[in-house]
UniProtKB/Swiss-Prot annotation:
A GO BP annotation: methylation
Lineage: Bacteria, Bacillati, Actinomycetota, Actinomycetes, Mycobacteriales
Enzyme class: transferase
Functional summary from the UniProt entry: Exhibits S-adenosyl-L-methionine-dependent methyltransferase activity.
Protein name: Putative S-adenosyl-L-methionine-dependent methyltransferase Mkms_0097
Keywords, sorted A to Z: Methyltransferase, S-adenosyl-L-methionine, Transferase
Keyword presence, Methyltransferase: yes
Entry EC number(s): 2.1.1.-
Pfam entry (one): LCM
Positions bound to S-adenosyl-L-methionine: 134, 163-164
Species the sequence originates in: Mycobacterium sp. (strain KMS)
SUPFAM superfamilies assigned: S-adenosyl-L-methionine-dependent methyltransferases
Length: 312
């Protein structure tokens, strides 16, 4: 159970779940500026610097990990791993959308889109519409920030400002979504912020809205032991204090670690989809991006990347 969440909580880009989007964008920005980057997101830095979230803006400093390493080598390894994880995750789901577009899908839905910039940075075929669903203030911040810098979407982009715990299918249809057309759906960095029953309901709604040939991709929720969570919390508090950075939000307290959460691939297989799951650890090692020492490796704490296609 999450200790900082309520049944109808809301947020903007600098608070609660909204601020986690800044963390992810900071990692994308850091990755983009590497010589051998897995992904290129030219807009991530813009989105981070205007958000005012302290520690995540610090990640933009090219010397950040090196500086942290001088004080706490293990914390530096964790930060390096976090950046690499986000790069690998982004790379994986970018490829998912590229394959969907090559298969002729022209209707895209990004759930809890946060500061996702794919509508702007991917090479979408003509006729593609990207629907982004998130809290209104989060969507407003992203679109306003990019517009101020003259950045235009690479596809038709439609904002659906609504909480996923409300009637988002009706709002999506109201924005022009056509359930009779195949759709590519993405739930990236989302499921861990939903209770188990809400996760099931989300996939039920996706299934109801999906024509045959639709595709869905999701990052599953990992589970971390409480003692390890506390250890991480204390370490990051020390780092923030030592380097005079704004204390980071305790992301672990925003997450629902429900023990009865359904396995996403199994759920999809049982509801008319054909699913495949790839371990994020496996994908990170395949791309030579694993940064954690062996004593910090916990299989249950890491997510899977699931993709599936609707059969009927």
């Amino acid at each position: 159970m999450s200790s900082l969440r309520t049944a109808d909580d809301t947020w903007d880009i600098a608070t609660s779940v909204g601020s986690t989007a800044v963390m992810v964008a900071a990692s994308r920005a850091a990755e983009t500026e590497r010589d051998e980057a897995l992904i290129r997101d030219p807009y991530a830095r813009l989105l981070v610097t205007g958000a005012g979230t302290g520690i995540w803006e610090s990640v933009l400093d090219a010397k950040f990990v090196e500086t942290v390493a001088a004080a706490d080598a293990e914390a530096a390894a964790i930060f390096e791993h976090m950046i690499s994880y986000q790069a690998v995750r982004t790379h994986f789901f970018d490829a998912f959308f590229t394959a969907a577009a090559e298969a002729g899908i022209r209707q895209i839905v990004i759930l809890a889109s946060g500061l996702d910039s794919r509508a702007y940075r991917l090479d979408w075929p003509s006729g593609t519409t990207v629907y982004e669903i998130d809290q209104p203030k989060v969507l407003e911040y992203k679109s306003a920030t990019l517009a101020e810098h003259g950045v235009e979407p690479a596809a038709t982009r439609r904002e659906v400002g609504i909480d996923l715990r409300h009637d988002w299918p009706a709002a999506l249809r109201g924005a022009g979504f056509d359930p009779s057309r195949p759709t590519a759906w993405l739930a990236e960095g989302l499921l861990m912020y939903l209770p188990a029953d809400a996760q099931d309901r989300l996939f039920e709604q996706i299934t109801e809205l999906s024509a045959p040939g639709s595709r869905v991709a999701a990052e599953t929720a990992g589970v971390q032991a409480e003692d390890r969570r506390q250890q991480m919390r204390e370490r990051f508090e020390r780092i923030a204090e030592k380097f005079d950075m704004t204390a980071s939000l305790d992301i672990q307290q925003l997450i629902y670690e429900d023990p009865d959460r359904a396995d996403v691939a199994d759920w999809l297989d049982a509801h008319g989809w054909t699913a495949t799951a790839v371990s994020s650890q496996q994908e990170m090692r395949r791309l030579d991006r694993w940064a954690l020492p062996a004593d910090l490796t916990d299989d249950d704490a890491f997510s899977n990347f699931v993709t599936a296609e609707k059969q009927s």
